[in-house]
Every structure is written in C-alpha cells, then in structure tokens.
C-alpha cells in the first residue's frame, strides 16, 4: 500500500541474493526470452472453498457457448461478510431477445460450484477505461449498491 507501511513491508522483500523484490501476488509466467504474461491478479479465495480467477472462469464460460450471451466477463469483489474472501459477479451483454433468467441455468451448469456468480448483471455493452475492461469502476458500482434489485 502506498500509505501503509505494513502492507509495503509485506510486498517488498529482501531475497537471499541481496536484491529487493516486489511480491504483487499476481499469477503468470515468463517465457525463455523474458516475456512476462500476467494471467490473473493474485489469489482470491471464496468462503467455503475454491480460489477465484477471472480468466479461467471466463474461459470456461466461453467454451460452454451459452446461447443468448454475446459477451461475458467476471468481476471479483471482496466478500463483506467474510474477511479476506471474495465473491464473483458475472456481467453479460445479451443477444437481442434474451434475459438473464434465460441464461442463468446454463451458466451455473457450466461452472464449478465455487465459480458460480452471486449475481448475473446484464449491461448494454462492456465498459472500458483506458482500453481495458473497467472492472474497478464496476467494483465501486457493486459496493455502492448500483445493481441491487
């Protein structure tokens, strides 16, 4: 954390080679030529079991080819009831004539129990900020109750 010494000390660690390394918690890999690929942003455990990661969840859902979904992506939000645990929300852009109720059963059948979204929210289009999906904006919207029914 920028203004949190304890969080900074936990993230920046001195290794046995004498160099300081930043431990972000991100998950990825480096190829032999030194190219780094980030797959997901750290660990996000779900209360009751399972570790949430948007990319594998989105890939599984895309592979299921759920009829009625034009685009889908997950947002992972802190669980307000369980410290250090998270909840998945699924955002979808639906094909014309479909509703969230039309896709819900197939979505849930396509995902492991721990991956199943606490809510499926339809949007007219995927929101972007600086050419990336605006997950942070959606997290703020979820936390503010914008999508509460």
Language model segments and positions:
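Conserved C-terminal "lid"/linker of ANL adenylate-forming enzymes
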Residues: 78, 89-91, 103-149
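AMP-binding/adenylate-forming catalytic core of the ANL superfamily
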Residues: 1, 9-115
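Acidic/polar helix N-cap motif
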Residues: 4-8, 134
